Curated annotation (Swiss-Prot):
The keyword DNA-binding does not apply. GO terms for biological process: base-excision repair, AP site formation via deaminated base removal. Excises uracil residues from the DNA which can arise as a result of misincorporation of dUMP residues by DNA polymerase or due to deamination of cytosine. SMART domains: UDG, UreE_C. This is Uracil-DNA glycosylase. GO terms for cellular component: cytoplasm. The active site is at 79 (proton acceptor). It comes from Xylella fastidiosa (strain 9a5c). Belongs to the uracil-DNA glycosylase (UDG) superfamily. UNG family. Its EC number is 3.2.2.27.
């Protein structure tokens, strides 16, 4: 079985490669028939010689980096970057050494304007994830050079369930919804229990329509401080200070 298919193989619950706290809360969803179909689809694409990103061991990296009870904030993306070597399981993030995508450049621009934090020399957002920011794409796999290739194949139901579970079982979280796609996915969120921050997508095509200047990073910390969860440290270390395992392309927590 190829790596992508193995990551969601549902022949036995014990084989699901999902961080233990998340497995307890949402793992049963991966046993559903539609997820079995998704696993078969991923295997078939691999057999056909198609490059699927991220590698199977990193499909669930967002959950590995941010266990269920450690989540403070959620940033929702759409699907992984579709260039070779970019995606590593965290939305908007790229592996160290990869060029910064335009949307991430705008995220860094807003971060500097909002909090005075200078742009780092890399695009790896794993430090945010390890500090409680769930960097969740709606679709967890993509094909080389084909943005959106795996939309409608089954991932959306699983990630909808993740968002709904956080909404119901946690309280006082911050959901940062950038763009209409993320905002539609976040409609289930109870704004009496959580803070929902909405803005345009950070893409260069839309960032000037409300993302730049949204101050979501400081608003997030203000809310978290008021609700006793502790603020997020949004700073990112220089590339040279990142964990060696990260530099080698492996999510380490």
């Amino acid at each position: 079985m190829n790596e992508q298919g193995e990551a969601i193989n549902n022949s036995a619950e014990s084989r699901i490669q999902l961080e233990s706290s998340w497995k307890a809360h949402v793992g049963n969803w991966l046993l559903r028939p539609e997820m079995r179909d998704l696993s078969a689809f991923l295997r078939a694409r691999k057999v056909a010689g198609v490059s699927v990103y991220p590698p199977g061991s990193q499909i669930f990296a967002a959950f590995e980096a941010t266990p269920f009870q450690r989540v403070k904030a959620v940033i929702l993306g759409q699907d992984p970057y579709h260039g070779q070597g970019q995606a590593h399981g965290l939305c908007f993030s790229v592996r160290p050494g990869m060029p910064l995508p335009p949307s991430l450049l705008n995220i860094y621009k807003e971060l500097e304007e909002d909090l005075g934090l200078l742009r780092p020399d890399h695009g790896c957002l794993l430090p945010w994830a390890k500090r409680g920011v769930l960097l969740l794409n709606a679709v967890l796999t993509v094909e080389d050079g084909r943005a959106g290739a795996h939309q409608g194949k089954g991932w959306e139901g699983f990630t909808d369930h993740v968002v709904d579970t956080l909404n119901r079982e946690r309280e006082g979280l911050v959901f940062m919804l950038w763009g209409s796609y993320a905002q539609a996915k976040g409609k289930v969120i109870d704004t009496r229990r959580h803070l929902v921050l909405k803005a345009a997508h950070p893409s260069p095509l839309s960032a000037h329509r409300g993302f730049l200047g949204c101050r979501h990073f400081s608003l997030c910390n203000q809310y978290l401080s008021q609700h006793g969860l502790g603020m997020v440290d949004w700073s990112l270390p220089p590339c040279i200070a990142l964990d060696g395992a990260i530099l080698n392309g492996r999510i380490a927590v």
